Amino acid sequence: MSHDATIERLYVLDAGIAQVDDASIYSPGFNVGKPMTLSCNAYLIRHRGQWMLWDTGTQDDLIGEPEGRIIAHGIRGTISKTIASQLQEIGVEPDEIGTLALSHAHYDHVGNCRLFTKAEWIVQTAEYEAMFGPDPDAFGFRPELYGMLRNNRLRLIEGDHDVYGDGAVRIIFTPGHTPGHCSLLLNLPETGRVVLSGDIAHNRRNFQCRCVPSFNVDAQQSIASMNRVEELLAAEGATLFVNHDIAQNATLPHAPDWLS
């Protein structure tokens, strides 16, 4: 498929790091007992003079805790910058974010939802039902981080979704990590097409090896989603940005710089 519309800018926001003592939770049977550090990002998109935020990062209140905090799945979250301060540096107020979408509802992706209660929230029906169902803890979700979104303007979707109707920003349904997990396909004027992975894999090697984390909700869906993204990369000539791949993350410009 081919789409001509392009976004104006993509800002990569630093959402801290995540640390685990046993990397095999992301690759069962491999790297057992080895520590692992993962990058965490949120992404600010400028399109048609409007602002969209993809994920909200690890909660800003960790800025006062240099040792971080174990939040879920035994993962320790640490931040060195707040999302709010990075938006301020760009010159954007939280209330100016018109559209909010989340790859999924784990803590490092929903930590600052409270800042964006004026935005229209786009969410897969399957993810919404897991987030607000009887047992969010079964999915590793923390409702205190995102519960306020119930009062946002809501756009419930099922499957792929063209956010602006012009092909520039397309939500790709990639379930398995969570029931309604999504990735994002962007078209940039200079960089070209980019897929923001969400958590379909936590580094490039795990993507290539089709490693399925032990806490994913559906292993078969997880592999199918990785296969689908690989096919999408080939069809679109797109580059994969693996959110938690700390080596790749070090090569990307971060806010206030941007990709165009």
For every predicted segment, state its role:
Residues E120-T125, L196-G198:
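Short hydrophobic/aromatic-enriched beta-strand-loop microsegments
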Residues Y11-L13, A101, I122, R155, ...:
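Hydrophobic/aromatic beta-strand patches that form the interior of the parallel beta-sheet core
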Residues Y107-C113, G180, A250-S260:
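Short, electropositive alpha-helical surface patch
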Residues E67-V123:
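Active-site metal-binding motif and surrounding structural segment of the metallo-beta-lactamase
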Residues M1-E96, Q124-P175, P179-F241, ...:
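Metallo-beta-lactamase
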Residues I7, I17-D21, R204-R210, A255-S260:
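Acidic, His/Gly-rich catalytic cores of divalent-metal-dependent hydrolytic chemistry
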